[in-house]
């Protein structure tokens, strides 16, 4: 996506984004599936007490073991509650859903984080977060709900974004993510391992 194509969401679209997030949180909590917010949604909540209007997705995180264990349950929950499943890939530990608006307006990205035994980081593709931020989650309150997030949250945001207090209107990850966070890792090695195990036992 070109920065020239960045679009600020309307108040109505932001309200629907909030509605869907709260629905998702309630569904996961009812099934006792632990989740947390991270990335741009967390940045907006801490800095602006709201969503970032030009952000296109809402990131909901899971520990990989929880996500894999509940994979089929989560997909069934989405289907039963009228979510559109726009993309899912078990190896990538990723499910993208949308509701009430198009996926272009808001994509809800449910993603598992793998622990890398070699580096001591929690990882996704080219994303690297030290274990200490994921060891003990903290709660933040917004929209009348409680959300778990990496802790300590402001230190985590500094690690991920650098100067996170200054809004940066861009879709280029090389511009808005810190070099400590955005670098190559063993993500695809773990994808291959999970694929092998999945095929072996299914």
Question: Which positions does each model-derived feature cover?
Answer:
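Acidic, glycine-rich loop-and-strand cores that form catalytic or ligand-binding grooves
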Residues: 74-121
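Helical scaffold of the NTase/Pol beta-like nucleotidyltransferase catalytic core
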Residues: 1-38
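Non-transmembrane alpha-helical segments in soluble domains
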Residues: 22-25, 29, 75, 79, ...
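Acidic carboxylate-rich catalytic motifs and surrounding loops in phosphoryl-/glycosyl-chemistry enzymes
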Residues: 39, 88-91, 171
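Catalytic cores of NTP-dependent nucleotidyl/adenyl transfer enzymes across multiple folds
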Residues: 12, 18, 104-202
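Active-site nucleotide-donor binding segment shared across nucleotidyl transfer reactions
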Residues: 25-58, 65
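Metal-dependent nucleotidyltransferase catalytic core
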Residues: 13-20, 61-92
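Short aromatic/hydrophobic-glycine micro-motifs
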Residues: 33, 80-84, 162-166
């Amino acid at each position: 996506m070109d920065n020239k194509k960045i679009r600020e969401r309307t108040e109505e679209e932001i309200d629907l984004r909030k509605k869907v997030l709260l629905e998702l949180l309630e569904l996961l909590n009812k099934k006792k599936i632990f989740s947390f917010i991270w990335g741009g949604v967390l940045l907006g909540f801490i800095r602006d007490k709201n969503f970032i209007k030009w952000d296109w997705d809402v990131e909901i995180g899971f520990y990989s073991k929880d996500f894999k264990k509940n994979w089929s349950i989560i997909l069934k929950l989405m289907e039963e509650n009228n979510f559109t499943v726009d993309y899912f890939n078990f190896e990538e530990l990723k499910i993208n859903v949308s509701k009430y608006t198009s996926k272009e307006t808001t994509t809800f990205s449910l993603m598992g984080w793998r622990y890398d035994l070699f580096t001591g980081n929690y990882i996704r593709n080219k994303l690297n977060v030290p274990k200490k931020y994921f060891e003990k989650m903290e709660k933040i309150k917004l929209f009348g709900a409680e959300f778990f997030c990496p802790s300590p949250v402001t230190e985590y945001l500094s690690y991920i974004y650098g100067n996170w207090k200054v809004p940066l209107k861009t879709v280029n990850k090389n511009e808005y993510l810190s070099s400590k966070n955005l670098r190559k890792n063993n993500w695809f090695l773990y994808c291959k391992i999970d694929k092998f195990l999945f095929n072996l036992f299914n």
